[in-house]
Amino acid sequence: MRKRRTLTAPSHFNSMSAALNPMKMAAMQSQPTVDDSWAASISRIMSLTAGDRHKFSSQPFANRLDAILEAVVPSRKDPTHEKVLTIVNALIENGAIRRDEGAGVYDALLHRVSKYNSINTQSNLERLAGDVREAVAQQVRIAAGNLGSLTALNSFLARLPANVERGQDNYTGFLSALKLLVSEVPNTEVYQSGPHYFLQSSRNGTQTVNLTNAFENLKPLWGVKAPTMERLSISALLTPNTRLLLLLVSPFTDSVSISRDSYLGYLLTLYREALGRNHLDERTLEEVTEVSKAMGNENINNLQATLNFLLTNRQKKIPKDYSLTPEEERIVRFIQQAVSLRMMQENLSPTEALDVTAANMEPSFYANNRDFINKLMDYFHRAAAIAPDYFLGAVMNPRWLPPEGFFTGVFDFPERDNYIWDGLDSSLDLTRQDAMRFLEEKFIDDDQRTESRSVSRVPTPASSRRSSVAMASDSLIRPMNNDKNSLREIEVLADKLARWKTYKRESEEARESLPVIVRPKKYSSAISSDESDDGMSKPDKFLKFEGSGNPFAHLRPKLGRCL
């Protein structure tokens, strides 16, 4: 019997699925006219006569003619109908049309292309086909984004044993969760560095786990089932690297694949629930205490000096909002106005003004608000005694409100600034000392400084500025003890001021010391002479600047002149 040979069209799209690739579906639907090369066409035609050369000649002429024409002159590489077919397949894949509607849409598109066949139509079809290819390529790139990490992970898993001594279900479930982590999370990578494999995650900061050391640490713990009281002692066997791996894998695990009875299942469940809750109950101190007991440290008092103890047992108090009622605020304004008027009109001290205000209150008004009035008056008395400036500002300010210390009883008044004149008996001491120092520095010359330093018994400023400033500061701070010396110093300064001459007095004395020059008087004759015609022989009465007399005498009216 002759063996029948079936014709199989070669396919070059093995990397993609036909159901997800419209171009591949179109290529497979038009495979005989698209992807057959010259040699493939000759082989296909000649295979029809293989074994029986008369078989090809016995076929209908139309079939033979089409096969020969296709083998000799193949069709265009990307004909129009294949572009339309690609678009129809993409529409079906995206759900725009149903599969049974594809033939009608394909036929309508072919008719429209044949009716409006032009360069624009071909370019539009080419652009649409390019968009389909780009979308498919992007989908493939997204799906295969972690191919490198998956390859490295598979290489690492190939080195692990397929079976473990106990806890095979937990072991298999953990490996599945690790694969799911690497494949689903975009910012997770697996790479090899030397003999070790590393898992790096960048979800909340960069975190790197040594997979080789972590699985080596987990090797004896896969099937361990520890009671509740013994879990703390077993937790000491886990390294921080292994705990980080369990924390990263825990969101992808469940209670079915990994049993909660095992110790690792208990930890994964704890991590998974902790990551799923936004608010955690702070039981860190209890956990640290239990760990300390498990390690053999029975003295719990040593843990009270740690920062963890201080933060855990710190009592958080919400600040209380203190405010006055409208009635209390009216009482405060009334007392402010009354005290300020007593101080300004009657010139009373703060304490006296408060006492007079309290004594003149109406009995019924005081009885109805006794507690608040006593509290307010006590606060004002304390402020007047401790901080008079603060008391004056509180009384004079029409918008003043009591601070928090008024309600709590913890009075915190601002400290009063210490000025230089606080140590003096009166303001005259400071004024007299300042005036004396200023006059000595400005009006005493060098001879008088030398004379006063050698004769006078009272201290005078030195010639240097430094000693003068030092003595001035000492005189300001230390009050005078000897009044006689003060009076004598004032008399000396008065005598020196009497001998001091101003510029005006010096000018007058210099003018008086000069000899007096007497000029002869010139008498003008009644008859004018015209000997010279230059006009300068006779002094002009309007340009008379020298000599004695009134220069404006010519402007004075003359008596006895008749009009």
UniProtKB/Swiss-Prot annotation:
Q: Where in the cell is it found?
A: Virion; Host nucleus
> According to the UniProt entry, which residue ranges have a biased composition of type Low complexity?
462-471
Q: Which residues form the propeptide?
A: 549-563
- The ranges of region (Peripentonal hexon-tethering domain) come to 1-117
Work out whether the entry's keyword set contains Phosphoprotein: yes
- Stretches for region Binding to hexon-linking protein: 148-261
Protein family membership: Belongs to the adenoviridae hexon-linking protein IIIa family.
Full protein name: Pre-hexon-linking protein IIIa
